[in-house]
């Protein structure tokens, strides 16, 4: 593709935090042009009325969702909609020749019975769902390149799976001992008002939620099972912390070989992610901080071994809105189009 040729893309559900992150990234992407911003609840409004800080670079209105119109204008469509809506739109867009990247949970599962159990929506699109590819490029790069439909991962699963993948793929841990303790900023709850995300409620406080029943649990387990080659069950507990963005997931598991030391695992992780430009393995004794990943598409991994308990401890830090959502979707787009994987994606944080 030449330097001046751009593909037309659309975003359905552009008014949420994931949507505005997509807009920001795609505005600066050299190979795309945003030709459609959609959302029925905001239809008719200038996009800059919703996000005034973009008044100088986004002149488009939010348009009503019209599949025929979208397909006639867009080669690629991002779906940033609530769970349970994308599965009604994606089949129609695919039929009309669009590539589709879904940021909801609708196409993350191979088994729709699992989806229906956890998301309380019956599905009849199994034939479409089996064509989707889980959009974690570090694990499924080749499949993403060949797919027309991507189910982009959740933010917690992204951080957790990147921490666990080398251990499961190489059989280094006892899978059923895996525990994921994860903490996220309030932007993960979305832009709509929620009591627990109010400043007066969240500031100066830390608490768990969705204990033993968070919807990201089956998503994590399905990919873990794929990596391990057998069914895997994990213990996952998320927490809300009083900051805007970022996830820190700390993963614990028992090593099969208690003789493994930290240096061994760092070597193993570096080899596993040697072709993954956005995963950074930290040196001995350095542990990640969410600030380092803020505004970037990076995942920082820190590794430790506790010889007293024979457990490995892996800490994973990402920006929940970039690597955990919009940035990862753009990373998948780059692969689908045959472009450089890092194109248009930030790798330097704002610091301090």
From Swiss-Prot:
GO terms for molecular function: N-acetyl-gamma-glutamyl-phosphate reductase activity; NAD binding; NADP+ binding. Coiled coil: none annotated. GO terms for biological process: L-arginine biosynthetic process. Pathway: Amino-acid biosynthesis; L-arginine biosynthesis; N(2)-acetyl-L-ornithine from L-glutamate: step 3/4. It is found in: Cytoplasm. It catalyses: N-acetyl-L-glutamate 5-semialdehyde + phosphate + NADP(+) = N-acetyl-L-glutamyl 5-phosphate + NADPH + H(+). GO terms for cellular component: cytoplasm. Keywords: Amino-acid biosynthesis, Arginine biosynthesis, Cytoplasm, NADP, Oxidoreductase. SUPFAM superfamilies: Glyceraldehyde-3-phosphate dehydrogenase-like, C-terminal domain, NAD(P)-binding Rossmann-fold domains. Belongs to the NAGSA dehydrogenase family. Type 1 subfamily. Catalyzes the NADPH-dependent reduction of N-acetyl-5-glutamyl phosphate to yield N-acetyl-L-glutamate 5-semialdehyde. This is N-acetyl-gamma-glutamyl-phosphate reductase. It comes from Gloeothece citriformis (strain PCC 7424). The gene is argC.
């Amino acid at each position: 593709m030449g330097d001046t040729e751009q593909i037309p893309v659309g975003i359905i559900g552009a008014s949420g935090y994931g949507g505005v992150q997509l807009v920001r990234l795609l505005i600066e992407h050299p190979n795309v042009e945003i030709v459609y911003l959609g959302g029925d609840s905001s239809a008719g409004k200038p996009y800059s009325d919703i996000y005034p800080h973009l008044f100088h670079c986004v002149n488009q209105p939010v348009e009503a969702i019209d599949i025929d119109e979208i397909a006639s204008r867009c080669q690629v469509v991002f779906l940033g909609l609530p769970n349970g809506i994308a599965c009604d739109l994606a089949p129609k867009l695919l039929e009309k020749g669009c590539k589709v990247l879904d940021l909801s949970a609708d196409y993350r599962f191979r088994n729709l019975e699992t989806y229906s159990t956890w998301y309380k929506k019956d599905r009849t699109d199994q034939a479409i769902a089996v064509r989707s590819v889980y959009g974690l490029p570090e694990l499924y790069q080749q499949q993403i390149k060949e797919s027309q439909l991507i189910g982009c991962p959740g933010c917690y699963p992204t951080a957790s799976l990147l921490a666990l993948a080398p251990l499961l793929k190489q059989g280094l841990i006892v899978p059923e001992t895996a525990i994921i303790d994860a903490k996220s900023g309030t932007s993960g709850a979305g832009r709509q008002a929620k009591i627990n995300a109010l400043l007066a409620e969240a500031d100066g406080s830390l608490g768990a939620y969705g204990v033993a029943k968070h919807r990201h649990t089956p998503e994590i387990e399905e990919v873990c099972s794929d990596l391990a080659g057998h069914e895997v069950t994990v213990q996952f507990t998320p927490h809300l912390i009083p900051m805007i963005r970022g996830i820190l997931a700390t993963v614990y598991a028992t090593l099969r070989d208690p003789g493994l030391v930290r240096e061994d695992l760092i070597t193993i992780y570096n080899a596993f992610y040697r072709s993954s430009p956005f995963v950074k393995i930290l040196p001995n004794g350095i542990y990640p901080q969410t600030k380092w990943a803020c505004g970037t598409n990076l995942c920082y991994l820190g590794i430790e071994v506790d010889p007293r308990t024979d457990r490995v401890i892996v800490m994973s830090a990402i920006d929940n809105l970039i690597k955990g959502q919009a940035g990862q979707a753009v990373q998948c787009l780059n692969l689908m189009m045959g472009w450089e994987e890092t194109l248009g994606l930030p790798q330097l944080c704002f610091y301090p």
